[in-house]
C-alpha cells in the first residue's frame, strides 16, 4: 500500500491500537483499519495508506467525504446553534429542510415530516405510526430484509440471524413474507421477474390465510431494493400488487428507503421508479452525508392521529444535522448531478456485465444487478448447488474477492448470506475515478 505524508506517529498509532481493546466486541466491522481523513472517493488511514472507497460509509456519504458545501454548512450552523431539542422549540434548519424535502417527494400526499437520528429509529417511528393510525398490531416484513438493530427494527430484520442472536424474545406481532428473489427461493434455474412476482404473491396470500389476517395487519414494510439481503430490486409489478392489497384491507404500505434514498438508485427516491405510492416513506443514510439524521414522511391525516409527546427524542432533527441535510438537498438539485449518477452507473454495469460473460468468470458470477450506484454482484456458492457443476466455486468467494480488493487499495463490502459483493460509490464519482477503481480491481 502506498503511503502519504502527514500520517500519525508510531506512538499515536500504538495508543490508538491499544484503545481498540476497549471497544465493545459486539460491533462487527469488515477491517481493522483506522481512518483519519477522507476526500471525495478516497480515505486515508492513520498510518498514511490511501484507499479508494466504494462503500461510502455504507451508502451514507453520498456526496463523498468532506464535501465542501456540506462542510461549510456544518461549520456555519455549529457557530450559531448546535442544539436546543425539538421538544423545546423549532429550529430554522429543521423547518427549512422540511420544506426542501416536501418539494422532492415522489407523491404529494407525503406532506408531513418527523426527523429522528438513525435509520433504525425511523423504522420504529413508522411502526408506532402504523399501529396508532390503523388500530391494528401486526407488521409484515420480508425474508432478507434489514431494518436495523434497535428492538422493533431488529424484530423486522430477516437478512441474517446475527442481528438478533441471543436477544429473543423480540417484539411480537411480526410476520415474514418471501421476497421475490430467485436465490431466496433456492431456484436452480433463474425464474423470470413475472414468475417470481406470482410466487411471492401466492406466498403472501398464504401468510394472510394462515398466520396474520388482514384485519390484524397494520402495515407491510419493504425495501424497494433489498439492501443487506443482496441488493435485489423488487419487481414493480409486485409493489403495485402490494398497493392494491393494502388499499383493500386498510393496511399501510411502508417503503424503507434508508439505503435507496437520495439519488442512490439514480432518482431522488427509488419510489419514483416504481410508480407506487407508499403511505410512509423512511429515510436516513444519504440524507445528511454522514451526520446522524433520519426521517419518516407520511400523510398529515395519519401523522395527526398521534398525540403530542408520543413521538420525539432529545437529539432528533438536530440543527447541525439538518443544516447538512439542506446542503445535500441543494447539491442534488445542481444541473448534471443525476446525469452523472446515470453515466457512472452505466459505466460500472457495462464492465460488470462483460466480466460476467468472460470465460474466466462465466458460471461463477451468476448475477449483476441493482439500480443507479447501488450495485450487487452475486457469485455462485455452496449454499445451493452450483449452476455450472464443471466450475465448482470455493466457499466464501465474496469475502475472498473483498480481501483481494483491499490488498489493491480498493474498499468494497459484502452483503447477505449469499455470495454477494456490493459497490456503493459516492454519487459524485467521476468517470476517471470509476475507471481507476475498476483497474484497481482488474474489472
For the regions a protein language model found, what residue spans apply to each?
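Conserved N-terminal phosphate-binding loop of PLP-dependent enzymes in the Aspartate aminotransferase
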Residues: 2-443
